[in-house]
């Protein structure tokens, strides 16, 4: 256990990406750019140990995956989809009917094409399809393309069923940096897209960083993380599994628990130690807990909030007797979960907001994925002659001050 100042003194995040990967990523991207599908099939065999004669999964296969899915899973995916869709519709930026007197305003248009990366390494993630493709669908994106790593037994039925529910246009079995390159450049089979979203490993993250500018991206994702503020009213057995749930994603997953009550932290530590040997996915969870788990004793409310805002975690959970004051004070988090019945895991699947959230302190300056990330925003300036005449002198004078005389002349010629 550390006090807040001790934690802050030692707190630092390693660079989210391993710079030594740069030449590997560059070579993969160049290979895909030059050799297209041939390179993708080679990398499927090299990295995923899977021979893929056909990169695209047919619409018939996608529909069959949904049709033959067990009813309980189908209903769960459908409920998640409906909640995500309803929430995203409620926050979507829309074009407003404006009075004729309004001379400057904004209009929104959906992106034409989007690529979605769905991880497929240590687990199957139909939830990622729902938390990304639904947003693109609500935005009105014309062409939604999913890429996901090939598996020896094929792409998981649940992932394909989620693609069917969200009306994804095409699904390709290709993963890693090579899939990001394919979506950026286009190949004989995979279409070039305008933007790529979705979480992935370091190779995926670095490829997105490397190719940004040639294609839009959502973020450079690092290891997943959660920070919780708790007091003596929190259910510590539930907190144990809030911590384990995050830790089971990745050995590098980070978990932080903050409390003003040192005894609560000691009790929690004891329960984690007791439960750990029997936890599912022990190899992953135990490494995360051993290396990336922190118990932090805060001296007061402001101290706890300061620590939380410094961490700027992907997920923040407040489980205290009176969580309301934290809603305004905790400013820099990907998503804020309030109360005993709002565990972070519910946000992973069915709450409504996307689970694609900023990591590695990037919540200090960016936000979680939303429907509005699939829209362009254009400003429209349509001035009347009267308005032009009211402001033209100021504009042409500023142009003169900046010695941009053609700018100035563009205005003067209209005044004459």
Curated annotation (Swiss-Prot):
Substrate binds at residues 224, 246, 249, 315, 348, 402, 407. It is an enzyme of class 1 (oxidoreductase). It comes from the Bacteria. GO terms for cellular component: cytosol. Its EC number is 1.1.1.23. Zn(2+) binds at residues 246, 249, 348, 407. It holds the Pfam family Histidinol_dh. Belongs to the histidinol dehydrogenase family. This is Histidinol dehydrogenase. The lineage of its organism: Bacteria, Bacillati, Bacillota, Bacilli, Bacillales.
